[in-house]
A protein has these predicted regions:
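Catalytic strand-loop segment that frames the active site of acyl-thioester-processing enzymes
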Residues: 1-31
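C-terminal binding/interaction regions
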Residues: 3-9, 86-93, 99-121
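Hydrophobic residues in beta-strands and at strand termini
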Residues: 14-16, 67, 113
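Short, charged, solvent-exposed linker or helix-capping segments at domain edges/interfaces
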Residues: 22-24, 120-123
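Conserved N-terminal beta-strand and adjoining loop/helix that marks the start
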Residues: 34-37
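Hydrophobic beta-strand-centered segment that forms part of the acyl-chain substrate-binding groove
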Residues: 45-78
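Hydrophobic beta-sheet segments that form the core/acyl-binding groove
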Residues: 65-100
Length: 123
């Protein structure tokens, strides 16, 4: 059952593929902000996936983040998503990213529950 307080953690290692220089968001070999955002969204998606009706998924519609500190190649980054509100199909999350014990990013994220077939038929 979807309820406030559900949490999920996603993890990734910083590689050349998820660095700013590779994703086009900067010129340095550090963990890219777009990669951090994707990891946060992944944590939120997985947080609620087991509780969705068959044939449903969630789609991200809003994210507001601050990327506080850089992370080097080889660092293990963890993103934690906590479900803070369920408003019908609208799901609100607090999200944070960590490099070890250091918070490197934080923010809020909104997802909506959608019927996959109906959603895809509108494309």
């Amino acid at each position: 059952m979807l309820k406030e307080g559900l949490e999920y953690t996603s993890e990734v290692v910083v590689t050349p593929a998820n660095c700013a220089s590779a994703v086009g968001s900067g010129g340095l070999d550090v963990f890219a902000t777009p990669s951090m955002v994707a990891l946060m969204e992944n944590a939120a998606m997985n947080c609620v996936a087991p509780y969705l009706p068959e044939g449903s998924t969630t789609v991200g519609t809003e994210i507001c983040t601050t990327h506080i500190k850089p992370s080097a190649l080889g660092a293990t980054i963890k993103a934690v998503a906590k479900l803070t509100a369920v408003e019908g199909r609208k799901l609100l999350f607090d999200v944070e990213a960590y490099d070890g014990d250091n918070c490197i990013g934080k923010g809020t994220h909104v997802r909506f529950i959608v019927d996959i077939e109906r959603f895809m038929s509108k494309l």
